[in-house]
């Protein structure tokens, strides 16, 4: 199947500011619209109704009261078809997701850090395209 690459609207939550800036600069440079970025999951949750996004990039370990899984659950409760890409150093995240019924039949993928930036863009495009096919 041919990849359809379009300008994606992206929300990112990543607690390491240098990594957040790296993702934003890379994805913006590829023509995507990084609509909003957050250093903490609670801030992202407060804004998800205000900003339309095609995909959500989420780290697992976040400051505050919510980790990445909890942020993703909040997003999926509001937007059940939302594509979610976890980018994390937490090696057991895939196991945790696979045990949680909230994520069954959802469009979710995990990439482990360190990850090449091109791999992030490819995963995003695949998740968004998968959503279109459903």
Give the location of each predicted region.
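A Lys-centered signature of the CheY-like receiver
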Residues: 113
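Two-component/phosphorelay signaling modules centered on CheY-like receiver
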Residues: 16-36, 41, 108
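Short amphipathic alpha-helix used as the core "switch/output" element in two-component signaling
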Residues: 69-80, 100-101
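Non-catalytic signal-transmission and effector/linker regions of two-component phosphorelay proteins
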Residues: 1-11, 17, 116-134
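Active-site residues of response regulator receiver
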Residues: 59-61
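Acidic catalytic/metal-coordinating carboxylates
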Residues: 40, 66-71
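As written
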Residues: 98-109
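Hydrophobic/aromatic residues positioned on beta-strands within the core alpha/beta folds
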Residues: 87-89
């Amino acid at each position: 199947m041919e990849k359809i690459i379009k300008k994606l609207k992206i929300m990112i939550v990543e607690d390491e500011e240098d990594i957040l800036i790296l993702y934003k600069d890379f994805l913006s440079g590829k023509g995507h619209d990084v609509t909003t970025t957050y250093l903490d999951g609670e801030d992202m949750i407060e804004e998800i109704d205000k900003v339309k996004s095609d995909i959500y990039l989420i780290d697992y370990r976040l400051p505050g009261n919510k980790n990445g899984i909890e942020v993703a659950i909040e997003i999926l409760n509001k937007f059940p078809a939302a594509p979610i890409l976890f980018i994390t150093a937490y090696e057991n995240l895939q196991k945790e997701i696979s045990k949680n019924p909230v994520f069954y039949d959802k469009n979710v993928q995990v990439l482990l850090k360190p990850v090449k930036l091109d791999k992030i863009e490819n995963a995003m495009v695949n998740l968004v395209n998968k959503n279109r096919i459903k």
